[in-house]
A protein has these predicted regions:
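Hydrophobic h-region of N-terminal signal peptides that target proteins for export
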Residues: 9-17
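Positively charged n-region of N-terminal signal peptides that target proteins for export
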Residues: 1-4
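Sequence signature of WD/YWTD-type beta-propeller architectures
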Residues: 19-21, 26-379
């Protein structure tokens, strides 16, 4: 279970009048101004960072939403609303956890938007290839969207790819850590990993169903790489395309469909009904549409030609697609629970990307030496 941070939350008509709202062209629209003056520096810094990256607040010493107080008695007041944080914390890490919980509460109270401050991101620290033709090592890491509390889970020099959350305590990933490349399961708290499924050939992509009971996997043990659904010791094959290659699966929010990439020379995004196995094509513009991720609100984010982040409605495919970024080296976008932000890789860094028109500019999640790739956000 996620550590519970107790909050005393009271909605009250504490302050008369409406909040001060500012319209900042190019970095987000209609934000609440907020001032954070809290006795604990770790709490204050983490809270302000999470409020700003939510896209709802902008720091201002004279903000109409004021956060004041000290440990165990912190209060946010403004625009007829009041929230209290009565949590006691004794070190910087627990202060940041309390701040994240409070940031989520403020996002819901003032912006009616789900907060993502407590949702971890799992990603890879890309290593160096030891020999020509050898697998490139990649270590599993986690952090929060605020960039604090980065944690490296593996350090074995082995290849790890496609990390995906099963739940807040468990990550599935593909690795050659025991020799053959197979699907593994790791307890994030203990960092203990065990092999979950073993097949002939090499798995090349996985996705966990919304309820955590099934895994969509690209497997080649029957010949060509095809899309399967794994549940316990059972498997169901969903595709049969001997002259194509499948990859990069992602589940619909209701667990009834799976979007995936199909193609060898060109790549397009398709969707298949898990029950009927009927598939249809979602993209047709350009020849390289990759990295789909299906969000809670039903939209799919993906990478189009030229490394551009796009968002589309599955019902209409890329006829409805909207560009989120300009062309560039964007990769592996993953939705936040707010249905607004994604985390994505570009170059050697990870960025938070606001998908709203005229939303915030992309922000680096953290600044650290290394090659950071393949993020997946807990939803």
């Amino acid at each position: 279970m996620r550590k519970t941070v107790l909050l005393g939350i009271v909605l009250a008509a504490a302050v008369a009048g409406a909040e001060q709202v500012v319209d900042i062209s190019g970095i987000g629209n209609k934000k609440f101004t907020v001032s954070v003056n809290v006795g604990n520096a770790a709490f204050a810094k983490c809270l302000q960072k999470n409020l700003e990256i939510s896209g709802l607040f902008i720091a201002n010493p004279n903000g109409s939403v004021k956060v004041t107080g000290n440990v165990g008695a912190i209060q946010a007041v403004g625009g007829g609303k009041s929230l209290s944080c009565t949590t006691a914390f004794s070190d910087d890490r627990s202060a940041r956890m309390a701040a994240r919980q409070f940031a989520n509460a403020m996002c819901e109270a003032w912006g009616q938007q789900k907060g993502f401050a407590l949702d971890k991101i799992v990603f890879l620290k890309h290593g160096k290839q030891h020999a020509v033709g050898a697998a490139v090592p990649g270590d599993l890491c986690t952090c929060y969207a605020d960039g604090y509390d980065i944690r490296q889970l593996t350090n074995d020099g082995k290849m790890s790819i496609f990390p995906r959350w099963k739940d807040e305590n468990t990550v599935y990933f593909i690795s050659d850590r025991s020799g053959a490349t197979q699907i593994w399961e790791m307890n994030v708290a203990t960092e203990q990993a065990k092999r979950k499924w073993s097949f002939r050939g090499t798995p090349t992509g996985i996705a966990v169903s919304p309820d955590g009971s099934k895994v969509a996997a690209i497997l080649s043990f029957q010949g060509n790489p095809e899309l399967y659904v794994l549940q316990g010791d059972r498997y169901t094959r969903l595709t049969e395309t001997p002259f194509e290659v499948e990859g990069q699966p992602t589940w619909s929010p209701d667990g009834k469909k799976i979007a995936f990439v199909r193609g060898d020379r060109t790549q397009q995004i398709w969707v298949v009904d898990v029950a009927t196995k009927k598939a249809r094509r979602l993209t047709s513009r350009g020849g390289k549409n990759l990295d789909p991720d299906w969000g809670r609100d039903g939209r799919i984010v993906y990478i189009a030609n030229g490394g551009q982040i796009m968002v589309m409605e599955p019902a209409t495919g890329d006829a409805s697609a909207q560009a989120v970024t300009t062309t560039g080296g964007w990769k592996h976008p993953s939705w936040a629970r707010d249905g607004r932000h994604v985390v994505a890789g570009s170059g050697k860094s990870l960025f938070l990307v606001d998908t709203l028109k005229d939303g915030d500019k992309p922000r680096a999640v953290f600044n650290a030496n290394g090659d950071w790739i393949s993020p997946s956000w807990m939803k």
